[in-house]
Amino acid sequence: MSQSVGFEWGFKAGGEGRPRAQGDGAGCAGATAAANSQQGCGHLVHMSYKVGKPKMKRRLTNEEHGGARRAKRQPAQFNVIQGQPLPVHRKIEMMDKAALQLTLLQLVAMHPEVQDSLSVLQPTSPDPAKYTELLEQKMQAVYDHIPYSKSSDMLNDYAFVRMKAAILEFLNCLIDCLLDAIPPRTTNLLQSFKFLAYGTRLLAQMPHFETESNNYYKNICYEQVSEIWNTLIRHASSDINFLSTKPSLLHYLHELKQFNEQTKGKFDIPLRLFYTIMDDYHTQTVPAAAAVASTSATVAEELNGNSKSMETLGIWNNVA
């Protein structure tokens, strides 16, 4: 066995490993020569040699192994199908109203430029019934947050803390809807006055707290609603068709007067503006009606007296 593989340590059996005497020197000349010679006399171990730990056998490499090398077994190839998320339109179909609304609001918050795209896709104002439905839901949420108390029915500071978030949500929603329901967003002034009166009545139904400072947001909203009344009345003053509908003017003037009395003068400015426009319109319409009547009489006299006056007035110039 070669040395690279290793060899056996220790003494061989049958006395082959014993040191021979001088008389036994049939195959070797002496002990020293026998120790240095390995021809015909086996392995002779010196007496002073100590047996140590066996040498570790090293592992043979692939090149040293005999025979052909066995190739590794390759796994079979299969078409693997992996999971994938739903498409966006499928996710939207599976969302309910609350989840879809929350997702859109988060998307707008992350990408503010999306607001312009939404305005382009939804250019028209929704149906007025949608406004009323939304505002009534917000108002109901305000009353749902009123804490129950057995000792007192009054709205104290603790109740304001509980209701503050719902109150701000309702007031902001009210102003947003009112601003979307007046010109130039809409051209129907009669519908605008109707919805503005509805929003003012709804604001009057807001709870009134014991501490006046807790009514701060409500009072600020009254000021904003009063400015919206001013704006809408100015738009109505330039619309002859709306001013000609006297019953509608008197109806909303009466409602605005009632709102001013209920709120102790919070609508004084729009009420005075309404009276001014009504007076100006009445002042302009009465002389105009008299002038039209006199002009008609003069034209009739000229028609009866002289046929040339018709050519002078140009009444028949455009008649085929």
From Swiss-Prot:
Superkingdom of origin organism: Eukaryota
Compartment(s) where it occurs, according to its Swiss-Prot or TrEMBL record: Cytoplasm; Nucleus
GO terms of biological process kind: chromosome segregation; nuclear protein quality control by the ubiquitin-proteasome system; proteasome localization; protein transport
Annotated Pfam families: Cut8
InterPro entries: Cut8/Sts1_fam, Cut8/Sts1_sf
Major localization class: cytoplasm
A GO MF term: proteasome binding
One GO CC term on file: cytoplasm
Keywords for this protein: Cytoplasm, Nucleus, Protein transport, Transport
Sequence similarity: Belongs to the cut8/STS1 family.
Subunit note: Binds the proteasome.
Protein purpose: Involved in ubiquitin-mediated protein degradation. Regulatory factor in the ubiquitin/proteasome pathway that controls the turnover of proteasome substrates. Targets proteasomes to the nucleus and facilitates the degradation of nuclear proteins.
Record protein name field: Tethering factor for nuclear proteasome STS1
Organism name: Eremothecium gossypii (strain ATCC 10895 / CBS 109.51 / FGSC 9923 / NRRL Y-1056) (Yeast)
UniProt lineage: Eukaryota, Fungi, Dikarya, Ascomycota, Saccharomycotina
Name of encoding gene: STS1
